[in-house]
Amino acid sequence: MPNFISEDQIEQALLQRLQHVCGFDVLNCHTADPADLNDGSGRIDKRDVLLPAHLTSAALRLNPQIPEPVVLAALARLSDRRQAMSLVAANREVDGLLRDGIAVNFEDAQGRPQQEQLRLIDFNAAANNEFLAASQLWIKCTGISALADYRRPDVLLYVNGIPLVFVELKNSNVKLRSAYSDNLTNYKNDIPQLFITNAFCVLSNAIETRLGSLTGQWEHFFGWLRVNDEKEKIDRAQIAEAGTSLERLAEGLFQRERLLDYVENFVLFHRETNKILAQNHQFIGVNHALAQFEERNAHSTDDKAARRKLGVFWHTQGSGKSFSMVFYVRKIFRKLTGNFTFVVVTDRDDLDGQIYRNFLNTGTVKAQDAAQPKNSEELRRFLGQNKRLVFTLIQKFRYAQGATYPVLSERDDIVVIVDEAHRTQYKSLAENMRAGLPNASYLAFTGTPLLGRERKTTSSLA
């Protein structure tokens, strides 16, 4: 049996790690009287969750080209509690503001109209932001059916005065599910204003740590034990015995650059009502694949073979492979300069439909974009155009027997994502695909262990 670890011990260990390892400032906001405003947060209303001084100074620093009155007016839009909206709708709206900024209009010194995006967070340079861990912050309840007057989260992680991460802790002898059922659920009901800006929630009793989104059910919360490598050996029994699960999550996700990367590129909404978070293996795997993409892209134009092979992204069955594709494509579109086209190739109608729907339902592709060709002829036409995304069955690369497959595009910024690329029965179709897209790069996704001939087939693709 693991030694008993109190909630306070877990909290203090986390704050120490956040301060000395992850680069956070730490603020203890506890007061004996919940209504006491003298808690160090700088708030003038206990219903507020934003830290006004931190928020304002960061916004002015990150947007020197925007007049101060315009900045302050924009921040008022962020502060709005959006009481007429559902919590998930409010969170989705603010998620867009955090990621893309707040659109503002103003006149410059010469009276010329200007339009800018006011940045709340600098996602490209962590050092330009302020990271703060606030513990024991009393918040006045605003929920219509609130069960208490005040609530006090254990730890909140702030970036530029904006609470992005909620952390609820329990003694090590308390079942972790109670942190979800008894705390997080009640907090969303009682202090919904805290979750309008929330990126994700963390629950821990040291023996076990899980994270999830504000829309996630308990069974959708997941662990985070690997730090840098999907192949890292994990001794779960030893981690539970030592009570270090939260330390591993902090090391793997709370480092400042990683936290910003996760919030910017690994959080999305599905059908506008379900908030989806990348799991541990997806975050590491997508970033590894993206690093390979950037490395291959840096090869000289003479090294065409190296540029065209992006490797294999291996997934266990049922571990969110199609969402990994979504995260991968979205991050490249957002972070890399280029006019990329992604062609997602599968061999079954159900897979093609599932992957397309996940791209569609996350807003990564639009219904009006006409990204699914109906037949081989339409596929060839699509690939000759400058579409951002195309989803197709490999069978649509069929061509008249004995005829040479035509070159459809010589662009070198086409990326073909091949699902289950080890399947060997499509050799001639794969040859047609390569002939039609001679300069494309290839990334293979598979959920099946590769052996012998299958490994060779996948190697030829990626």
Regions found by a protein language model. Name each.
Residues M1-T341, D350-K366, Q385-R388, Q395, ...:
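ATP-dependent helicase/translocase motor core
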Residues C29-T31, A371-Q372, G447:
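Proline- and acidic/polar-enriched loop/turn elements at helix boundaries
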Residues K170, T346, E420:
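Conserved residues at beta->alpha junctions
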Residues L176-R177, S213-T215, F222, Q395-Y405, ...:
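Signature of the SF2 helicase/ATPase Hel1-core->accessory helical subdomain module
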Residues Y187-N189, V329-K331, N375-E378, Q401-Y405, ...:
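A generic local structural motif
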Residues T346-D349, D369-E378, I394-Y399:
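Conserved helicase motor
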Residues K374-V390, V407-L408:
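Conserved motor-coupling elements within RecA-like helicase/translocase cores
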